[in-house]
């Protein structure tokens, strides 16, 4: 009896073209079943392998998954159904770190991704101790000396404001999003006690993509992982490298929504229409749909007993 095993790697950072190039190489090396899905910059790479028994199928599936992990390196953030938001939240909880946003637009981007997840209030203040507090918000400003030294530098200004947010709140990380301005592409930035890291963004990205970029930048900073080509690191108030979108990222196209469950016939009720959408199929034979995954349940209300620290 043939046994089939499926493993799903979750990836964030490369473009669709870069991911596709890697998968074509893996396919040409003999991987029997590959499926690529994408949503708001997150990729799900499905490896499906069949063998005469379960042990062999698991061995072959693990082999190809390990090959893919080696190819994508620090771009792999999880396996299975774990989203980038959940993976970053888990890392913050594990390391007992606190995150704040410098302003309401940035807080909204992060809050929309983190709020549905249990225990998110233990690591993110949702503005209550930062931009939504009138007294503290007035203190989260760009230092005057930084403005004088780098007049008109939007990146330095964002870093200075993030540094002020750290000092005002006592948090470990402060995040900022800046839309496009004259002479500067849109970017996201994360600041901690060591300095700042910023990532340039392609134009016309949706809010979820931008929020994911902040979370990925934070994830890489938390674990000391390699940054993407569109990122720079610097100390606020000191000279910095030029922040531009990498050549590969400029060709990034629009995203396609997906969930890890099989497509169902469309209905008029959006709540009962699956949004599984294959982006590319790398199988040589007829494509085989991945097994059905249950619809994720609505997350429960935050646990008041969850471990947390108080912002100052």
Name the predicted role of every residue range.
Residues 56-261, 312:
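Short alpha-helical segments enriched in small residues
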């Amino acid at each position: 009896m043939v046994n089939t095993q499926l493993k799903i790697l979750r990836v964030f950072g490369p473009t669709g073209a870069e991911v596709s190039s890697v998968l074509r190489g893996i396919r040409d090396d003999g991987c029997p079943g590959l499926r690529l899905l994408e949503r708001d910059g997150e990729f799900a790479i499905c490896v499906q392998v069949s063998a005469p028994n379960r042990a062999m199928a698991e061995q072959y599936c693990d082999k190809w998954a390990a090959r893919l992990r080696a190819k994508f390196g620090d771009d792999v953030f999880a396996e299975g159904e774990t989203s980038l938001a959940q993976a970053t939240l888990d890392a913050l909880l594990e390391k007992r770190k606190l995150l704040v946003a410098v302003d309401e637009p940035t807080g909204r981007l992060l809050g929309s991704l983190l709020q549905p997840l249990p225990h998110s209030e233990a690591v993110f203040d949702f503005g209550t101790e930062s931009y939504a507090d009138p007294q503290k918000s007035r203190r989260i400003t760009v230092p005057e000396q930084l403005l004088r030294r780098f007049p008109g530098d939007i990146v330095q200004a964002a870093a200075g404001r993030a540094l002020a947010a750290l000092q005002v709140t006592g948090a470990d990380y402060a995040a900022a999003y800046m839309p496009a301005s004259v002479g500067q592409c849109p970017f996201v930035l994360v600041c901690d006690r060591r300095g700042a890291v910023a990532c340039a963004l392609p134009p016309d990205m949706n809010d979820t993509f931008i929020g994911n970029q902040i979370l990925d930048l934070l994830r890489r900073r938390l674990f000391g992982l390699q940054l993407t080509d569109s990122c720079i690191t610097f100390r606020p108030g000191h000279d910095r490298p030029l922040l531009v979108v990498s050549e590969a990222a400029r060709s990034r196209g629009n995203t396609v929504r997906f969930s890890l469950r099989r497509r169902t016939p469309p209905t008029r009720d959006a709540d009962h229409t699956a949004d599984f959408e294959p982006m590319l199929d790398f199988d040589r034979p007829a494509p085989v749909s991945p097994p059905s995954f249950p619809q994720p349940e609505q997350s429960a209300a935050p646990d008041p007993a969850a471990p947390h620290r108080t912002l100052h």
